[in-house]
């Protein structure tokens, strides 16, 4: 089975925490969940995969090619949604749309706003609020829309349903299926 990400002997050491060594792979064309106790290192692992946090040792192979998330078009191929603040607290929806369109070639503002509509964020009241005044669930909807509005091969989502109500979690599961199905076996979710 082809792998979208392969992690070998991966370690990350902090003062009070050590991750690894970790050896695992994520298959292409599937949604794979990382399950573990709070504080086990799931977020750290995802941050390393996305190039947000540096690894102490080991390798991460992306799409069978490289161990460097900054090389080539790797960052264009990976969409990321954190469980915490991804953008400055004073930003509004329009600021996020602008920054994402400048940062990523394959970000669609039209798709972003359409997804916000599906997720119930585009009413006048919510779309003009700064992130700091949105509920956690509303912020997560904005973060998810920003990730799904990019044309990527891999989505890395950190606890995407944790702050969503049951209806929004159902919509999120539908979005996962649509994303995987639209990739003809080439798209994956972690």
Predicted segment positions?
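Helix N-cap at the start of a conserved alpha-helix in ABC-type nucleotide-binding domains
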Residues: 166-168
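Helix-to-loop junction immediately C-terminal to a conserved catalytic motif
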Residues: 50
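The feature captures the beta-strand-to-loop junction immediately N-terminal to the Walker
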Residues: 35-37
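ABC-family P-loop ATPase nucleotide-binding domains
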Residues: 83-142
């Amino acid at each position: 089975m082809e792998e979208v990400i392969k992690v070998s002997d991966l370690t990350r050491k902090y003062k009070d925490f050590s991750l690894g060594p970790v050896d695992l792979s994520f298959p292409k064309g599937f949604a794979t969940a990382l399950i573990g106790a709070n504080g086990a290192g799931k977020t750290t692992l995802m941050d390393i995969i996305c190039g947000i946090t540096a690894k102490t040792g080991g390798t991460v192979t992306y799409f069978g090619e490289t161990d460097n998330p900054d090389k080539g078009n790797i960052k264009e191929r990976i969409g990321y949604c954190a469980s915490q603040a991804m953008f400055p607290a004073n930003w509004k929806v329009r600021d996020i749309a602008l920054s994402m369109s400048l940062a990523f070639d394959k970000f669609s503002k039209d798709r972003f706003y359409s997804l916000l509509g599906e997720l119930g964020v585009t009413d006048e009241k919510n779309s003009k609020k700064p992130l700091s005044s949105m509920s956690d669930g509303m912020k997560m909807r904005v973060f998810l829309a920003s990730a799904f509005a990019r044309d990527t091969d891999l989505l890395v989502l950190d606890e995407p349903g944790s702050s969503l109500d049951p209806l929004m979690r159902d919509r999120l599961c539908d979005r996962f299926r649509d994303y995987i199905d639209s990739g003809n076996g080439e798209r994956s979710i972690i």
